[in-house]
Each structure stands twice: as structure tokens, then as C-alpha cells.
């Protein structure tokens, strides 16, 4: 059983990220956000994913769906990190490594499964 990301809390986190790091505020498509946040829930309902598979599904869905005007890759990374934290894990990767890996996921240079494997090796218990 997983603790899922609350949509409103995620919107606040994304907004805070834009304030801190720059970018245009706004949601481009609510349906795409809902789809991205539902992706890991559906994965868990119809499969046997671990916490890292679900975190990767958050990252992939948010980065690929582009629900926001700006900061979609950042949103994907934040979604993965938030989900991991809610479920007892914390990221341990360097900022550079995390950025390069997230960019590779968004560019389809690594798969969602590859990203889940990367998360497994770059986390620790919270």
C-alpha cells in the first residue's frame, strides 16, 4: 500500500519551485496533470510495482505529459522525490546527476524502467 501524492500539495510544491528557480506560473492542461498523477496509481492497481517503479511513473508522466506552462521536467523530478519521501525514502543523488538523469528520461534516452533502477541506487531510508 502506497501513500499517493495529493494534487493540491503537488501544485503548491510546483509553484514554490517556480518561485525559487524561475519559470512561468500556470497549468496548461488539467487533464494531463490528472493523467500524470494517476499513472502510478493505475500501475499499482494492475501490476505489482515497487515504490521506485511508482516514483518513476510520476517522473515519466509529468515530464512527458507537459501539464504545466513551465517546469515540467522539474515537476517530474519533484513528483518522484515527493512520492519517495511520502513512502519512507529520500533521494541521495547529487544535483548534477539527478538533473542529467531527469533530462535523459524526458528526452527518451533512458526508459521509465531505467529511471526506476536509477532511483533504487540513489535513495536511502528517510
What are these regions (language model features)?
Residues 1-126:
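FIC/Doc superfamily catalytic core
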Amino acid at each position: 500500500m502506497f501513500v499517493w501524492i495529493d494534487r493540491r500539495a503537488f501544485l503548491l510544491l510546483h509553484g514554490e519551485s517556480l518561485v525559487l528557480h524561475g519559470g512561468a506560473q500556470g497549468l496548461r492542461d488539467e487533464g494531463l496533470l490528472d493523467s500524470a498523477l494517476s499513472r502510478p496509481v493505475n500501475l499499482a492497481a494492475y501490476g505489482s510495482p515497487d515504490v521506485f517503479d511508482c516514483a518513476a511513473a510520476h517522473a515519466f508522466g509529468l515530464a512527458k505529459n507537459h501539464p504545466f506552462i513551465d517546469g515540467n521536467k522539474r515537476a517530474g523530478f519533484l513528483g518522484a522525490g515527493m512520492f519517495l519521501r511520502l513512502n519512507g525514502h529520500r533521494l541521495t543523488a547529487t544535483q548534477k546527476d539527478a538533473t542529467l538523469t531527469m533530462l535523459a528520461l524526458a528526452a527518451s534516452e533512458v526508459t521509465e524502467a531505467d529511471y526506476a533502477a536509477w532511483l533504487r541506487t540513489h535513495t536511502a531510508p528517510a
